[in-house]
Structures are given as structure tokens and as C-alpha cells.
């Protein structure tokens, strides 16, 4: 499929890391700490920071998702519509694993059996099912959400938020969401949002109201629901004292950016995709473990689901 809205282009693009605690760093750490590597003296495992431990945990989950998706894609009884979805999940998970820095390998090569080692990388059983894939994606989105809310680094926060969005959307492709998430306004608990994010939500509100007025069901109902959701965020943000500079947020596209797609649908994709990018930025700017951070992560997932419902593609995340 074609590339979807490039969330990376708004601040998510990050330099590729070497493998977590890679050989050079591990050897340096071992030497600097004076750990004994001599005969009869098994070395201790190098210690990892909390940030590296979190990344490693997510990398292991990405590896498990890739493994599970690979089994499902190749299984003989897999539904013809599910197999390509599973293959797409596998390819994306492989890229996510690389972005996360890979799974930590403590030693450069085979070492004596007396040396401690890290836990093996998890992998799927040979009879893994579609439900197993849905479970690994659901678990992954929960892990990534918690990591995003608690991350100390702005860069990590944005990466983990994008990962939360990606795994949530992929889970929805396999098993459609049975119930809506807690609304952003409830999670925010009266916290303010940035001017840019407020403007993005207000642009979405206006666009959805216009689209609803010009459309017939079921598109009218979808647009009206989206307008209500965006309005609730705008009203709550203004009530909380967020700076309000919304002039110029209402420009409609003169034509569709995608062939065979109406200008209205293209507009809907545009405004909700812009909110995904703005929420990811907001998450990085908010303090760790606060309602504002949690609300931004929640808002990113919700906006991505709304954009996807209009046909936007986020397969390139993170």
C-alpha cells in the first residue's frame, strides 16, 4: 500500500541507534567497571539503564509480534484476507525492532556455559493463531502506552507514542475494537494543551461539521461523531486556560490530494492525521507520568483511529 501520513516528518524522525548495549559499549563498560573476565571468573551481565530496559522490553515484544505474524501469514488455514494483513504486520514489526535498537545481546560471541546470559528472545509457537497475533499486538500497545506515559526522554516519548498508535491500529485490523477508549478529555483531567494542538483540533471540528452538512449517511453520521469528539477537546482545553489562537485553522482543500477520493474525504484524513502528529509532539513536550502525557498518548490513538476510518494509512509508523 502507499505511504500514509508521515508522522515521522513532524518530529518523529530519529537517528538509528546501534543495538542496545552493543558490543563496543558492553566491552567498554566491562573494562571500566573492572569486571573479571579471566579464567574461572564468570563475568556479571552489564547493567542497563531503565530507559534501555524499557526499549529492550518493547524490542522483545516487536520480535514476538513479528514471529507470531510470520506463523499466521504462512499457516495453511489462514483466511485469504488475514494472511496479507499478517505479512504486513510482520514487515512492520521487523522495522520497529530495528528502530528500537534491537534486542540486547550481552556477549559478542559464544561464551562458556558458566557465563550469565540474557533471556532468550521470545518467539511464537508453530501453531500460533490469529487470536494469538491479536493478543501480542494488544499486549504490545499496552506496554508501549505505559512506556510513553512514563518515559523521561522526549525522543523516547514520541517513539513510544507512535508505537502505541501503530500496534493499536494493527490490533484493530485483526480484531476490530469492541469498545471505545476513554475520551481524551476525561484522561486530561483539566490539563492545558499547546496552541498548535488546540488549533489542530479546532480545524478538525470545523472540517467535520462542514463534511457532515454536505454528506449523506453513513458519512454524515461518522463526520458528526468526529465533530462532537473534536469539539469536546476544544471546549475542555479553552476552559482549562489553554492559549486560544484559532484564526486561520479552517482552510479547506480546493481538491483531493488522492485520485478517486473526494475532497471531503481527503479533508477528513488531513485534519485527523494532523492531530496524530500534533499529539505525538504534545506527548514529547508533556512531563512524564502526568495526565497531560497520558492524554496526549490517548489522543494520538483516538485521532489515528478516526483518520483510519476515513481511509488514512499509518502503516509506516513509527
Where are the regions a protein language model picked out?
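Twin-arginine (Tat) signal peptide motif
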Residues: 11-20
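N-terminal secretory signal peptides that target proteins for export/translocation
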Residues: 1-9
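All-alpha RGS (Regulator of G-protein Signaling) helical domain and cognate RGS-like helical scaffolds
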Residues: 8-10, 24-25, 29, 34-318
